[in-house]
Amino acid sequence: MGALAKRFRAGDWSSHLGLERARHLGSHMAEYLPCPYADFNGADLLYFANFQAIVDRAEWHWQRFDEPPVIAGRDLFFHGNVNLGEALELSFSAVEFGQGGLAHWCEVRRGSDGEKIADVVTRKRWRVR
């Protein structure tokens, strides 16, 4: 997993969780301002669990599905953190919508300097009722 994280950080990957980077190019952008009361821990670091929650919120604001999909797989690669008061820029750089569900790769960057602090690859399946 460590080698894969290095490849993501360097932008040197082609396929992960069935998402093909070159074939599923995306361009949706979102901004998120983490809440100092809910998103950070006592050391003023963004909670690791909140990275995926932030990506899910951005996806929900972008694509409000009648039936929200359920998570089938997700990998997060952490490269840094953000300071209190700094906004995050989320770039959905690869996106796939299909019969079985959706997948996306989200690059999370600090708004202040554009430094990538996380890569989040998510695969979701459509809900069956």
What residue ranges belong to the model's regions?
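Non-catalytic linker/capping segments at the edges of enzyme domains
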Residues: 1-43
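HotDog/MaoC-like acyl-thioester-processing domains
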Residues: 1-5, 82-84, 94-129
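Short, well-structured alpha-helical interface segments that form or flank functional binding sites
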Residues: 46, 50, 83, 87
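Active-site helix/loop of acyl-thioester processing domains in fatty-acid/polyketide metabolism
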Residues: 47-69
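Short structured motifs
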Residues: 73-78
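Short tryptophan-centered beta-strand motifs in secreted/extracellular beta-sheet-rich domains
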Residues: 90-92
